[in-house]
Curated annotation (Swiss-Prot):
Underlying gene: Gria3
Record keyword Cell division present: no
Organism: Rattus norvegicus (Rat)
Any GO CC annotation of this UniProt entry: synaptic cleft
Pfam families: ANF_receptor, Lig_chan, Lig_chan-Glu_bd
Transmembrane segments: 547-567, 622-642, 818-838
Complex formation: Homotetramer or heterotetramer of pore-forming glutamate receptor subunits. Tetramers may be formed by the dimerization of dimers. Interacts with PICK1, GRIP1 and GRIP2. Found in a complex with GRIA1, GRIA2, GRIA4, CNIH2, CNIH3, CACNG2, CACNG3, CACNG4, CACNG5, CACNG7 and CACNG8. Interacts with CACNG5. Found in a complex with GRIA1, GRIA2, GRIA4, DLG4, CACNG8 and CNIH2.
Keywords: Cell membrane, Disulfide bond, Glycoprotein, Ion channel, Ion transport, Ligand-gated ion channel, Lipoprotein, Membrane, Palmitate, Phosphoprotein, Postsynaptic cell membrane, Receptor, Signal, Synapse, Transmembrane, Transmembrane helix, Transport
A biological-process GO annotation: protein homotetramerization
CDD domains: PBP1_iGluR_AMPA_GluR3, PBP2_iGluR_AMPA
Protein name as annotated: Glutamate receptor 3
Carbohydrate attachment residues: 57, 260, 374, 409, 416
Length: 888
């Protein structure tokens, strides 16, 4: 009996504490259903309840809000059912939560059957369902208004399966009426980002430039990332983002490309309520409220906050109307068959639909089906200069553009801002000054491109800031990720406005950025270490004529001498007889020969004529003189030609290069060769279909260690240190410049492998492109480009025109040049001494024999001879017999 009394007293106290004001509860319990990716929304939900409960105004807070939260897995229908039933069994008055395509039907069915109101910021549905209060406004009307305003007649519609069917149906109906060409693609179930890329590439092949993207923020960011990677964010493209969180989307990488981006914004950041909420929001403890302090507020979080306002306002209305919504007893079983609805659920639903309140998302009202009505959506545009509010849309006025805030064009706006000019540290284009640490801004740099950027800025009338590219690369696209690096990446991803650098104009780059007319023409060339100058040989004086010619001269000399000898033998005019009337001769002197051109005299005559010297004898006969004349003519031409070439051969020390062309490189393996790791030169070999270059690319990509260098300086250093075992392939202009720099040990060999040019680059479709192009053309016509090249290449050269040696040194002869002449002189003198010694010995021996013969003759005196005999005359070893008898 006592226990029964105590139990009765306990329930009486609970009833007195829990109910007041005509049976209205002091605590309103609401449920919360959240998915995995709604972390910030969960924090906003709890913070909004906290803000309401800590409100000091009792008229605004006649009751206390309490919540019960469950997390559900939308892919598991049992999890969805269990989460809802868990909330219903707790006796909550209303449920706030999210749904997707898989869980929407389950949740709305339970709400309709059990008369439990479900307040959601998820995508709105066109179905006429009861007990569902949709916080998110429908975008269908705003999208159709903007399509008409922009006069889109051909576009691509990318939609999320969960939300896009109703909009797709409306667009297709409008397309039939307006003769639009619409390509619709569902992207809701795509998990691989490569599929987004394939869709964009396919649409680009169809010349599609306009896209309507109807997805959640995360998916839009993924699609735009692929758009940027593919370079489809340039001028001429227009993207309309059918999402209420335009400021939530990551647009920093897209905005500088030049494409027009239009979107919708439901949260007005200039609203005092929004500003006040954000001030408190950023001061929250991240551990208690995840994604609050260090993450921007999402529009779905703002809708979550407004949902708590709507729930609180609805129960205020019920309290003012003295509607008894108190729960008595158990809430019942949500799975009961038949379902047992809550009797007060209709009153709560009616109160929620009657709410009209100002929230963070503007005016909040609902129609009889729980859909937002009488709302205003801001329309934003994003261009190079930034984003701005382009107008607004509502159900009555439709789209209203702001005509008094027209966007200024990019070129005029660029005059009022500092243009970022990306470049690369590469001599002589951009270099640090010696005292750069004491300077600031653009004054720290010098070089060809520094001067060129200054001249272009002066003509275009812009302010600019030089920015050195972070990765030190020119720009190439990764074959796997398709992401651009280097200066091209700076332009593609909007981190720079202009690139003034030795950036080669190529097809793949032209697809994603714009180039001016070339400011410098060049080609790929080969750099090698300058070989050692070949020392002249001992007989280098023979080099002016080929050895074949020398052999022919020797044979000609012998032949002429023999012919002269024979001609002198046969011609009677070369013979002369002794005169009997001549005065008596010394019996000891030899007689004069009747023919002077014996074989030795013929050789001596030919040698004297060849050496341009005289001779004591000369031909008397006409035939002999003909031989001498043609020989003199022959020697005149030969000696003149020899003398003409002798100066060049003796004064120039030639260098023997191991290679002379790309073909020489390709067919050998001793000398390695490579290019920059990222740039047009590497791309040239990778894409080339010429057999020689294909062979070179096959070698380079498989060579170990790698033959690709990070910078040009690394490649040059490798050439200098490799002792002639590495050749570097680079632009001819850089090759020529380095050849003029100390230590003057590199050289360019062969011709250019291709023909191309350097250009000033701008983002695709940038308004600066045309102005920059005109500036480059003007500078070229004025001759300033040639003047700049001469200034930085040759006027500041350190090796001179001879590659490091002065003119005086190259024209002076060294002993090694003429050593052979001295050797011949010494050899000739030595030979003469030896021959003289032999002659002396021979003559001494002959004289000794003659003296002995004379003594013997004196001792023996024979009788005088009475007969006559022929007198024989000897001349230089040959017997010439006379025809007459001479008396002795």
């Amino acid at each position: 009996m006592g226990q029964s009394v105590l139990r009765a007293v306990f329930f009486l106290v609970l009833g007195l504490l829990g109910h007041s004001h005509g049976g209205f509860p002091n605590t309103i319990s609401i449920g919360g259903l959240f998915m995995r990716n709604t972390v910030q929304e969960h924090s906003a939900f709890r913070f909004a309840v906290q803000l309401y409960n800590t409100n000091q105004n009792t008229t605004e807070k006649p009751f206390h809000l309490n919540y019960h939260v469950d997390h559900l897995d939308s892919s598991n229908s049992f999890s969805v059912t269990n989460a809802f039933c868990s909330q219903f069994s707790r006796g909550v008055y209303a449920i706030f939560g999210f749904y997707d395509q898989m869980s929407m039907n389950t949740l709305t069915s339970f709400c309709g059957a059990l008369h439990t109101s479900f307040v959601t910021p998820s995508f709105p549905t066109d179905a006429d369902v009861q007990f569902v209060i949709q916080m998110r406004p429908a975008l269908k009307g705003a999208i159709l208004s903007l399509l008409s305003y922009y006069k889109w007649e051909k576009f691509v519609y990318l939609y999320d399966t969960e939300r896009g069917f109703s909009v797709l149906q409306a667009i297709m109906e409008a397309a039939v009426q307006n003769n639009w060409q619409v390509t619709a693609r569902s992207v809701g179930n795509i998990k691989d980002v490569q599929e987004f890329r394939r869709i964009i590439e396919e649409m680009d092949r169809r010349q599609e430039k306009r896209y309507l993207i109807d997805c959640e923020v995360e998916r839009i960011n993924t699609i735009l990332e692929q758009v940027v990677i593919l370079g489809k964010h340039s001028r001429g493209y227009h993207y309309m983002l059918a999402n209420l969180g335009f400021t939530d989307i990551l647009l920093e990488r897209v905005m500088h490309g030049g494409a027009n981006i239009t979107g919708f914004q439901i949260v007005n950041n200039e609203n005092p309520m929004v500003q006040q909420f954000i001030q408190r929001w950023v001061r929250l403890d991240e551990r208690e409220f995840p994604e609050a302090k260090n993450a921007p507020l999402k529009y779905t979080s703002a809708l979550t906050h407004d949902a708590i306002l709507v729930i609180a306002e609805a129960f205020r209305y019920l309290r003012r109307q003295r509607v008894d919504v108190s729960r008595r007893g158990s809430a019942g079983d949500c799975l009961a068959n038949p379902a047992v609805p809550w009797s007060q659920g209709i009153d709560i639903e009616r109160a929620l639909k009657m709410v009209q309140v100002q929230g963070m998302t503007g005016n909040i009202q609902f129609d009889t089906y729980g859909r937002r009505t009488n709302y205003t959506i801001d329309v934003y545009e994003m261009k190079v200069s930034g984003s701005r509010k382009a107008g607004y849309w509502n159900e009555y006025e439709r789209f209203v553009p702001f005509s008094d805030q027209q966007i200024s064009n990019d070129s005029s706006s660029s005059e009022n801002r500092t243009i970022v000019v990306t470049t690369i540290l590469e001599s002589p284009y951009v270099m640090y000054k010696k005292n750069h640490e004491q300077l600031e801004g653009n004054e720290r740099y010098e070089g060809y491109c520094v001067d060129l950027a200054y001249e272009i800025a002066k003509h275009v009338r812009i302010k600019y800031k030089l920015s050195i590219v972070g990765d030190g690369k020119y720009g190439a696209r990764d074959p796997e990720t398709k992401i651009w690096n280097g200066m091209v990446g700076e332009l593609v991803y909007g981190r720079a406005d202009i690139a003034v650098a030795p950036l080669t104009i190529t097809l793949v780059r032209e697809e994603v950025i714009d180039f001016s007319k070339p400011f410098m023409s060049l080609g790929i060339s080969i750099m090698i270490k300058k070989p050692q100058k070949s020392k002249p040989g001992v007989f280098s004086f023979l080099d002016p004529l080929a050895y074949e010619i020398w052999m022919c001269i020797v044979f000609a000399y012998i032949g002429v001498s023999v012919v002269l000898f024979l001609v002198s033998r046969f011609s009677p005019y070369e013979w002369h007889l002794e005169d009997n009337n001549e005065e008596p001769r010394d019996p000891q002197s030899p007689p004069d020969p009747p023919n002077e051109f014996g074989i030795f005299n013929s050789l001596w005559f030919s040698l004297g004529a060849f050496m341009q010297q005289g001779c004591d004898i000369s031909p008397r006969s006409l035939s002999g003189r003909i031989v001498g004349g043609v020989w003199w003519f022959f020697t005149l031409i030969i000696i003149s030609s020899y003398t003409a070439n002798l100066a060049a051969f003796l004064t120039v020390e030639r260098m023997v290069s191991p290679i002379e062309s790309a073909e020489d490189l390709a067919k050998q393996t001793e000398i390695a060769y490579g290019t920059l790791d990222s740039g047009s030169t590497k791309e040239f070999f990778r894409r080339s279909k010429i057999a020689v270059y294909e062979k070179m690319w096959s070698y380079m990509k498989s060579a170990e260690p790698s033959v690709f260098t990070k910078t040009t300086a690394d490649g040059v250093a490798r050439v200098r240190k490799s002792k002639g075992k590495f050749a570097f392939l680079l632009e001819s202009t850089m090759n020529e410049y380095i050849e003029q720099r100390k230590p003057c040990d590199t050289m360019k060999v062969g011709g250019n492998l291709d023909s191309k040019g350097y250009g000033v680059a701008t983002p695709k479709g940038s308004a600066l492109g045309n102005a920059v192009n005109l500036a480059v053309l003007k500078l070229n016509e004025q001759g300033l480009l040639d003047k700049l090249k001469n200034k930085w290449w040759y006027d500041k050269g350190e090796c001179g025109s001879g590659g490091g040696d002065s003119k005086d040194k190259t024209s002076a002869l060294s002993l090694s040049n003429v050593a052979g002449v001295f050797y011949i002189l010494v050899g000739g003198l030595g030979l003469a001494m030896m021959v003289a010694l032999i002659e002396f010995c021979y003559k001494s021996r002959a004289e000794s024999k003659r003296m002995k013969l004379t003594k013997n003759t004196q001792n023996f005196k024979p009788a005088p001879a009475t007969n006559t005999q022929n007198y024989a005359t000897y001349r230089e070893g040959y017997n010439v017999y006379g025809t007459e008898s001479v008396k002795i």
